[in-house]
Swiss-Prot record:
It comes from Macaca fascicularis (Crab-eating macaque). One of its GO terms (cellular component) is U2-type precatalytic spliceosome. The modification N-acetylserine is found at residue 2. Residues 177-193, 231-241, 276-287, 305-348, 360-372, 426-438, 458-473 have a biased composition (Basic and acidic residues). This is Spliceosome-associated protein CWC27 homolog.
Amino acid sequence: MSNIYIQEPPTNGKVLLKTTAGDIDIELWSKEAPKACRNFIQLCLEAYYDNTIFHRVVPGFIVQGGDPTGTGSGGESIYGAPFKDEFHSRLRFNRRGLVAMANAGSHDNGSQFFFTLGRADELNNKHTIFGKVTGDTVYNMLRLSEVDIDDEERPHNPHKIKSCEVLFNPFDDIIPREIKRPKKEKPEEEVKKLKPKGTKNFSLLSFGEEAEEEEEEVNRVSQSMKGKSKSSHDLLKDDPHLSSVPVVESEKGDAAGDLDDDGEDESAEYDEYVDGDEKNLMRERIAKKLKKDTSANVKSAGEGEVEKKSVSRSEELRKEARQLKRELLAAKQKKVENEAKQAEKRSEEEEATPDGAVAEYRREKQKYEALRKQQSKKGTSREDQTLALLNQFKSKLTQAIAETPENDIPETEVEDDEGWMSHVLQFEDKSRKVKDASMQDSDTFEIYDPRNPVNKRRREESKKLMREKKERR
């Protein structure tokens, strides 16, 4: 695959297509196909491709888009007419990820383009290759083909281009046009036909006369109430059930007997108009209403008591938690004190024993415990202490080296812990001597003396071997 990339010329220009399948980076061959690249870049700058769909998908072959109508037969170039094809000997349809112009014939290029999904040798010298998909965005390009298509190679749910962004424009003289897109004609608003009001035929009803009288009364009241807000007293002046005297509600906390008495007092004003049955009905209604109010008050009071109980319960739990914390802390402190007392008793008992080895062990233990207590905790003080110990060790080393002479280095004993400080590592130098060709010394030239007995013996042996070889032949 690398030999294919090497054969392709370098690119000059870059565009980013933001699609519903992901971003797609396109690098352009603006020197090899200048007209196609100029057309593509200017259409991207003019947002010509925004919200256009990929209307044609051939799996394993191409994905085509760039038609604002979405039919496959639309789209115009920036030149106002189709422009010529631009073929190049180093640009071939030999792999996926190539971007080329779609056309209906030779020299019929507009705004539509397509991506290749594989090798397509049959398209060579028929379509202008002007770009390639780069990087990992090639996988987003492949996702464009992962849709269901019909018999006409049109996807059921096509992907679309959301927007275009020109990252590098090799043409500095491009001036985007102001394209006036035709507005979609809104459908004519349907005229709502007012349905004529149907006339009510009361003669068909058994109680037609009464219903007709009620209808006339309602119409008369509605006509008189237009533009005004009135109470029920104003609306129903002739209603015997309503009194012109305002009713004063008794307190909600009164007993049921008081409510009945108040109802009797108020009903005395219109006994002339109301029958006994109607009076009982009114009493029942008022009693029900007041019962509802009292039940609501009881509920609210019960809820308040529940809230108070829950608050008091939570306070008790908090107090118990605080008390438990105090008890735990006290028990912990008591445990620490008991352990300290037991340790003191043990130390006193151990000191009382006269054994020398045990006494020495205790002294060493106390010594290390004292050192451990002197060590500070982690932090800046601990770091300072570590640096101080390091400097102390360095000074000790330099002092040991200065005290011991370089030439006379005595062998240290195993028990001498400080002998290693002044010890110097020495070993035999076994490195080979490298001969310099420019320097001539006694070892430069090889000396061969034929009179040397060793050389004589070697010559005789070699002659003997040669004779034996000849005899064998």
